Design a protein with these regions (language model features):
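Leucine-rich repeat
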Residues: 14-19, 27, 34-39, 47, ...
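Conserved hydrophobic beta-strand positions in leucine-rich repeat
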Residues: 1-3, 21-23, 41-43, 61-63, ...
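Intrinsic-disorder/low-complexity detector
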Residues: 4, 9, 13, 19-20, ...
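Leucine-rich repeat domain C-terminal region
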Residues: 82-85, 93-151
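Canonical leucine-rich repeat
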Residues: 11-14, 31-34, 51-54, 71-74, ...
C-alpha cells in the first residue's frame, strides 16, 4: 500500500494480507493495528507519537522525523530500523538474531534523538549489526563502552 504525500491524519483498518506499508509524508499521529504478515513500514515525516505492537514478520521499520518518545519491542525478524530525528530517550533491547544467515547485515539508524541509555546487549552484538547513535546525549560511561567495542 503506497499512500505517501496525501496529508492523511488517520488510516483505516489495514488488510490482513498487507506486506508493504508506505505512508511517508502525511500527518499521521498514530498507526492502526498492524497486520501479522507486514514486512515493511515506511512512516517517515509524520507526527507519530507512538507505535502499535510490531508484527513478528517485520523486516524494515522506518519512522524518521516523527515525535516518538518510546519504541515497542522489536521483532527478531527486523533487519533495518531508522528512528532518526525523534524524541526517543532510550531504545528497547535489540533482537538477538539466531535464525538468519551470517550474511544478513543488520542496520539500525538512531541519530538525532535524546537517547541517554542503550540496552546492554548493544555492547555485545554481532559485527554484522551496525547501530548509528550520532547526535544523542549518551552518558560518558556509555560512550566509553562503545568506543572500547569499536577499538
Amino acid at each position: 500500500l503506497d499512500a505517501c504525500d496525501n496529508r492523511l491524519s488517520t488510516l483505516p483498518e489495514l488488510p490482513a494480507s498487507l506486506k508493504h506499508l508506505d505512508v511517508d509524508n502525511n500527518q499521521l499521529t498514530m498507526l492502526p493495528e498492524l497486520p501479522a504478515l507486514l514486512e515493511y513500514i515506511n512512516a517517515d515525516n509524520n507526527q507519530l507519537t507512538m507505535l502499535p505492537e510490531l508484527p513478528t514478520s517485520l523486516e524494515v521499520l522506518s519512522v524518521r522525523n516523527n515525535q516518538l518518545t518510546f519504541l515497542p519491542e522489536l521483532p527478531e525478524s527486523l533487519e533495518a530500523l531508522d528512528v532518526s530525528t525523534n524524541l526517543l530517550e532510550s531504545l528497547p533491547a535489540v533482537p538477538v538474531r539466531n535464525h538468519h544467515s551470517e550474511e544478513t547485515e543488520i542496520f539500525f539508524r538512531c541519530r538525532e534523538n535524546r537517547i541517554t541509555h542503550i540496552p546492554e546487549n548493544i555492547l555485545s552484538l554481532d559485527p554484522t549489526c551496525t547501530i548509528i547513535l550520532e547526535d544523542n546525549p549518551l552518558s560518558s560511561r556509555i560512550r566509553e563502552s562503545l568506543s572500547q567495542q569499536t577499538a
